């Protein structure tokens, strides 16, 4: 079910009554309750598809429970990640530098962004994982590959389930069109593992403030949106993830709300490509990670992406006389090239606003290859 909230997004006339009772973020005092979706569909698949579509339209983010990913698969991924990050720095560097794949520390991208973290980025294909595995787990690279591949397969299935539900909830003529983008054999999906050690900067702030909250939280990973189609995140029980609510972002406010950790759940958020594909109906939410002085935070994110040649353009069902095309057509490769020239916090989609003479709406690729 979706956690009730005070206000609902626009969901179409048929869904208006349901949207009024089930909105996106429930405000309780100064806190915010993240929308929760039970993926086991206790009220039926039709209601589940509407719930997922409402959550992604209103906030671009939800907590998925009863998601079907086996706990043993998640536990094995956690153990493999922890075993890597506990290694000596020189040993971890053998899996780097991040170009953009591999091991990295503090530096995020090539444009000056830094954070209080270390990370490992892998392409989500078995062959790509195998090529890096010997530098990550020299004792048993095949074991590491198997753990990552099992995890990727389970989380990819969850991502596909979400995208199929979105296709149904949005009323697409072909509800599987979004899923086919990330299941193409040459998809560009990634797996990213972030490790945030307790922050010395935050500890210094605690000391200066007499043990109270640090005046300025240490930034583990700065403000950004995810560029791909969909992100599926799981983390341990350390907090740190924060969201910038869409209404606050539109008003130019910087009101960040914390997301309570839940290691048993997955957190799903809309990426830039999905916002473009749905002509802005679904929202790519801005988020960041702050680091405290408590326990380390370990998170694993599956970034579901299409092939590099995939053509990203608003789906026909999302364009109408009252809802003109917001973004011009582009390929994922073009979007990535632009992304690599910008700082982390840049609103990348602003550079792809539609102009006169853009092509027809649709989703596909440059050479009709899937």
Swiss-Prot record:
Cofactor(s) essential for the protein: Fe(2+)
Annotated source species: Oryza sativa subsp. japonica (Rice)
Catalysed conversion reaction: gibberellin A1 + 2-oxoglutarate + O2 = gibberellin A8 + succinate + CO2
Family as reported in the entry's similarity comment: Belongs to the iron/ascorbate-dependent oxidoreductase family. GA2OX subfamily.
Known role: Catalyzes the 2-beta-hydroxylation of several biologically active gibberellins, leading to the homeostatic regulation of their endogenous level. Catabolism of gibberellins (GAs) plays a central role in plant development.
Positions of Fe cation binding: 224, 226, 287
Protein name per Swiss-Prot or TrEMBL: Gibberellin 2-beta-dioxygenase 2
Residue intervals of the Fe2OG dioxygenase domain: 186-306
Keyword Oxidoreductase applies: yes
InterPro entries membership: DIOX_N (IPR026992), IPNS-like_FE2OG_OXY (IPR044861), IPNS-like_sf (IPR027443), Iron_ascorbate_oxido_reductase (IPR050231), Oxoglu/Fe-dep_dioxygenase_dom (IPR005123)
């Amino acid at each position: 079910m979706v956690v009730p909230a005070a206000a609902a997004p626009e969901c179409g006339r048929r869904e208006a009554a349901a949207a009024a009772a089930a909105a996106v973020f429930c405000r309780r005092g100064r806190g915010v309750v993240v929308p929760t979706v039970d993926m086991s569909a206790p009220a039926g698949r039709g209601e589940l598809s509407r719930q997922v579509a409402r959550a992604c339209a209103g906030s671009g983010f939800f907590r998925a429970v009863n998601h079907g990913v086996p706990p043993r698969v998640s536990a094995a991924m956690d153990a493999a990640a922890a075993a890597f990050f506990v290694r000596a720095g020189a040993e971890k560097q053998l899996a780097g530098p991040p170009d953009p794949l591999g091991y990295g520390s503090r530096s995020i991208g090539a444009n000056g962004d830094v954070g209080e973290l270390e990370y490992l980025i892998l392409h989500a294909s078995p062959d790509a994982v195998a090529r890096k595995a010997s530098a990550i787990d020299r004792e048993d690279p095949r074991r590491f590959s198997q753990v990552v591949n099992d995890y990727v397969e389970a989380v990819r299935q969850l991502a596909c389930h979400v995208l199929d539900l979105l296709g149904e909830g949005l009323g697409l003529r072909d509800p599987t069109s979004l899923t086919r983008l990330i299941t193409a054999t040459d998809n560009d999906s990634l797996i990213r593992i972030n490790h945030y050690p307790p922050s010395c900067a935050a500890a210094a702030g605690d000391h200066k403030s007499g043990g109270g909250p640090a005046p300025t939280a240490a930034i583990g990973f700065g403000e950004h949106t995810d560029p791909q189609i969909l992100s599926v995140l799981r983390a341990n029980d350390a907090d740190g993830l924060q969201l910038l609510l869409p209404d606050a972002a539109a008003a130019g406010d910087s009101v960040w709300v914390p997301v309570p950790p839940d290691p048993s759940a997955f957190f799903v958020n809309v990426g830039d490509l999905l916002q473009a594909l749905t002509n802005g109906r679904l929202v790519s939410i801005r988020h960041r990670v702050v680091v405290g002085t408590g326990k380390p935070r370990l998170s694993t994110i599956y970034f579901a992406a299409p092939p590099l040649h995939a053509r990203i353009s608003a789906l026909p069902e999302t364009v109408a006389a009252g809802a003109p095309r917001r973004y011009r057509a582009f390929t994922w490769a073009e979007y990535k090239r632009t992304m690599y020239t910008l700082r982390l916090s840049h609103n990348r989609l602003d550079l792809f606003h539609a102009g006169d003479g853009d092509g027809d709406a649709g989703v596909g690729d440059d050479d009709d290859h899937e």
